[in-house]
Amino acid sequence: MEDIKNEVKKACLEILEKSKAKAGDVFILGGSSSEILGYKIGSHSSGEVGEEVVKTLLEILNEKNIYLGVGGCEHINRAIVVERELAFRDRYEIVSVVPQIHAGGSFATAAYKYFKDPVVIEHISG
């Protein structure tokens, strides 16, 4: 898990630097814990990997006051987990779904677990 954490941290910091992200911006995560483990997408979902990735990103992004949005899988129509505060700020429509590891994906499930006040929105625009 330490290797995954280090790779996530490195990638996040590089993206933030190149994008010139600032406080209040939204960093969107989409991906597959199965692929991180070297398997076909959706075939070996890992809650442990999902939690490690999300917790690592939150550690970095919260310090910079950047929101994390986490895309779910096709089972929840690729809806995005965000903090309620962001959904209200930007007037995103909240949908009624709670991600699960095999119906939403491990990243969205971890986000729903670790966010302060998580909600799920249909899409982000802007």
Label every model-predicted segment.
Residues 1-27, 43-60:
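N-terminal glycine-/serine-/threonine-rich phosphate-binding loop
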Residues 6, 32, 62-65, 77:
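Detector for Asparagine
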Residues 37:
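Glycine/Thr-rich phosphate-binding loops of Rossmann-like dinucleotide-binding domains
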